[in-house]
Amino acid sequence: MHMFAAFYFVIVLTIEKEWNISYDQLIRLWSLGALLIGLGAIPFGWLSDKWSRSGTMTIMFIGMGLASILCGLSTSVSFLFFSLSLLGLFCSIYHPVGIPWVIHAANKQGRALGVNGIFGGVGIGSGAFVAGTLTELLNWQLAFILPGLISIIIGFILIYLILIDKISYKNYFIKNDDQDHSRNEMILIALIMLLSMFALGLSFHNTQTALPKVFEIRIGNTSSIQIGFMIAIIYFISGATTFVGGLLADRFNLKTIYLIGIFLQFPCYLGIAYISGYSLVVLCILAAVFNASILPTENLLLGKFTPQKYHGVVYGIKFILAFGSGPISVFLISEIYSITLEFTYLFLINAIMMAI
């Protein structure tokens, strides 16, 4: 999912030149897709609760593949907008479905979420690298189409494994350890997490979406492959630290880990706002590491304070906040770039959110 959601941010740099349309106009085409990654989370989470998590995942793989192929076949702005929106809708399936799938299939939940996070980081990083490489060696159309075909194949492999009972069609649940919490405690935790999930989601989208263009501007003389490679390194490393974050979540106080991880992002974004050259890449790595390492903690906190039977819907709500901030991010990036031709104010916004 992360791989497919990351393709356009690199590919758009080539489309900008081929179609002779400005970056701020083209990046807006992702607005509805970014919104649907959030809005699709609740209905697909509900579907997985009522039907089957593994079955819903097959819809994701096949749907993402078809949508990505349509993106590659686009010859107009309107059709590309439609295809990207469809891609965002199918990308919305993973988090409200996949996270509960992982949690309920594991004994050490923090460790399991950490391993899952490694692949999330690899997906983001490889998405940029694959898109940059295929665009440079072949063309931007095949950068969408080839991964789309692979995703469809994976979807049918998953269907086959379900049919032969290698993967369960039914939903698993861990031993019931739902806890009773006071109303005031639940409200306080909910408010804090709502604010933090939105802020973390917006800062993540701001960074992931703008980074290819930021590197093009501030590092200079970089090809699509080089930009994709640098972004791949950033998210490969951050994905690995998600595993470390999962181990910490199994051993230490969840609230403490969460607060420290948020605060440490503040100086990173402050530096990113002003620094150029390869030092910028180092700061981006640190920001991504601190952002990714607290994700297992966040998911465990959310699961701890909500009933298991509603986890699909609950995680759907979470990802509406986290990914529903995507259109706001696209708007900010488009407006800030069109006015300043830079992204300093974008990363200052990130820093302020982490400080608050």
For the regions a language model picked out, list residue spans one by one:
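Extracytoplasmic gate region of multi-pass secondary transporters
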Residues: Y8-F9, I189-G239
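C-terminal transmembrane helical hairpin of 12-TM major facilitator-type secondary transporters
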Residues: F252-L301
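A late C-terminal transmembrane helix in Major Facilitator Superfamily
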Residues: F305, K309-T340
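Conserved MFS/SLC helix-loop-helix module at the cytosolic interface between two early adjacent transmembrane helices
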Residues: L39-V77, A249-F252
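Helix-breaking motifs and short loop linkers at transmembrane-helix boundaries and internal kinks
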Residues: N20, S52, L73-S78, N107, ...
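Residue-level signature of mid-helix packing/kink "hotspots" within the transmembrane helices
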Residues: A6, A34-I42, I124-G125, Y235-F243, ...
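Cytoplasmic helix-loop-helix junction between adjacent transmembrane helices
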Residues: S83-G121
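Helix-loop-helix hairpin linking two adjacent transmembrane segments in secondary transporters
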Residues: N116-K166
